[in-house]
Amino acid sequence: MLVARNLTKEYQSGTQKLAVLKDVSFAIPQGTFVAIVGPSGSGKTTLLGLLAGLDVPSRGTVEIDGVDLHDLSEDARALLRGQKVGFVFQSFQLIPTLTAIENVQVPLELRGEPGAAARAGELLARVGLGDRLDHFPTQLSGGEQQRVAIARAFSNRPRILFADEPTGNLDGTTGTRIVELLTALNREEGATVVLVTHDIGIAERTQRIIRLADGVVVEDKLTGTTA
C-alpha cells in the first residue's frame, strides 16, 4: 500500500513561498496501475519524487507498506528504494557503454544477487528483447531502449514501479506498446505501477487516474480497466 497524507511541497522564491503541491492525499492499494495526469506545472513530477522518497515534503507524509518515509534517514530511504522501488524515466538512462543485458545485469550484481546474468536474460526475453541481449543502446530503437529500462526497473522485483513520462520520447504506437508491457508486468509481478503522463489516452489504459491542477487533486477516478 502506498499512502500520501496531506502532502505539501513549498519552495522559497525570493521573499515568498511557492506551493507546488497543496494538501494532496490518497491511498493506492498494492498491485494497482495508476496514472497521474495534469498540465505542465501541475506538480506531477514533484509528487512522484515525494512518493518515491527522492525528495521530502514541506508537510505531510508518505507511507510505503506501512513505513513512514519521514521517519527514515536519507540512507534508510535509499535502502528502501533499492529493496522495494523501481524507476523508469522518459530519457531511458541506460549506460551507453554497456550492452542491453549488462544494463540489466550490473545493478543485480551490485546488489550481490546470485544468478544475475540468468535473471537479466529472462527479463529481457519477457520484454521481447531476447535476440538483442548483446546490442548497445545506440543499436536499439527508442522503444527497445525503453524496454531495456523497464527490464532493469523490474530486476529487483519491486513492490512499486514509478514511471515518469515513459512514453514521452516515443511515437504513439510505440508508446502504446510500452504501456501494454507495463500492464502485463503489473499483472504478472503484482507490482504497483504509478505512471506520470500528459497523454490522457495512455492514462485511460490504467486502472485509476489522479488528476492534478495547480498542485491540487481535482479528480480521482477509476477507469473501468482491469489489470
Language model features: what each stretch is:
Residues 216-227:
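Conserved beta-strand-loop-alpha-helix hinge in the C-terminal portion
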Residues 1-212, 217:
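ABC family nucleotide-binding domain
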